[in-house]
Amino acid sequence: MLVTRFAPSPTGYLHIGGLRTALYNYLYARANGGKFLLRIEDTDLKRNSEEATQAIKEAFAWCKLDHDGEVTYQSRRFEIYKEYVAKLLAEGKAYKCYMSKEELDELRKEQEARKERPKYDNRYRDFTGTPPAGIEPVIRIKAPLSGEILIRDGIKGEVKFKVEDILDDFIIARSDGTPTYNFTVVVDDALMGVTHVIRGDDHLSNTPKQIVLYDALGFKRPEFFHVAMINGEDGKKLSKRHGATDVMEYKRMGYLPEALLNFLVRLGWSHGDDEIFSIEDMLKYFDPHDINKSSSTYNAQKLDWLNAHYIKTLPYERLADEMKEFGVDFRALPKGELLLNSLRERSKTLVEMSQSAKAIIDAPAAYDEKAYAKFITPSSLEILAKFAEILTLNLDAAGYEKITNEFLEQNGLKLKDLAQALRVALTGSSVSPSIFEVLEVLGSKEIKQRIQNILKERK
């Protein structure tokens, strides 16, 4: 069975690059009838954050990336790691190193002075003497001393590393007994049955060490896919200076999970010229072998465009549910569905939609200064006052359009003579959906009241 995993460290909030990695793993597993596992790599007890762990789970729930089985926590598996360290020691594949920090620092200085790559010199690899007093040893793996390590990567193809350039007898357990990152990753991936590892290419340099450990422990190597990083539009690695990076911040900014996942799947992968991908489409077409080798570029305008698409196309009930979190209960409004459907056509985010809705639902507490100065004049106020007099019944948008056109014709006016001033009176702004839909939503009594308010404001 194909098994993938996502394995974040809870030392910070989930980054959108991490969510893309999770999505790729999720899609590959689900499309092939496999399992998608979640592992929290929380062995750094000083830097771990319970808030960060919860944020990861919240992001998964928001995006509906359901994982199989229970979450695996590395901090609860130290005894398992100790067993495998002991196994390597017993088999002579690892050894205790008593080199002090001072000795390591001195060795590094000497190597740098000779312009050599700093690395451990294997002095305790075959040590049989009496250990020095007062030093708790670290445990090092016996790595190959020469040759090449070949990685057959599903994205990058064959990647070769010269042992002399990349490896030394690296540490697998610290002097306090805690295991190192590469060791825990290998043990857990093997015991969890992970067959395919899709991760960022910042992990590529770890892979030779992990391959050494897979082989030493007698575990089958998984297939690796190393995904190029996401860059900002300036070509530099994506960071906070390019905008939001925390996944849940996108929710707070009014982005839909469908839009964010669609956006992320396309950062490095494509299917023809298609831009819109539902989860069902992704499951049908996604293959990690098709991921681009080169870095992708974050494009905020593309995300806005996708979000606007999903706002326009989501079913009313679902969009109304989403909008409740932004303080607007469209179902509780007499003309809620009409208002939502009118606003969705011009909204890029749910925050924007919420602001537009509140501007219509609530009578203006203030008026946009520029719009007021431009459109609220003695003549426009006179027109508004006359228009209010014809409002006797609640009509639909077509009905309001009919009586408005009759009013304009009878008074020798054009729509522009009324519409913008009416928008300002009703919403406080010169920007709104169709003025006739706004009239239907508000009803004649509320329209007249808001016109009266602006007439009083001007006196």
UniProtKB/Swiss-Prot annotation:
Keywords annotated in UniProt: Aminoacyl-tRNA synthetase, ATP-binding, Cytoplasm, Ligase, Nucleotide-binding, Protein biosynthesis
GO terms classed as biological process: glutamyl-tRNA aminoacylation
Enzyme type, top EC level: ligase
PROSITE patterns noted in UniProt: AA_TRNA_LIGASE_I
Any one GO molecular-function label of the UniProt entry: tRNA binding
InterPro entries tied to this protein: aa-tRNA-synth_I_cd-bd, aa-tRNA-synth_I_codon-bd_sub2, aa-tRNA-synth_I_CS, aa_tRNA-synth_I_cd-bd_sf, Glu-tRNA-ligase_bac/mito, Glu/Gln-tRNA-synth, Glu/Gln-tRNA-synth_Ib_cat-dom, GluQ/Sye
Entries under NCBIfam families matching the protein: gltX_bact
Function: Catalyzes the attachment of glutamate to tRNA(Glu) in a two-step reaction: glutamate is first activated by ATP to form Glu-AMP and then transferred to the acceptor end of tRNA(Glu).
Protein name (database record): Glutamate--tRNA ligase 2
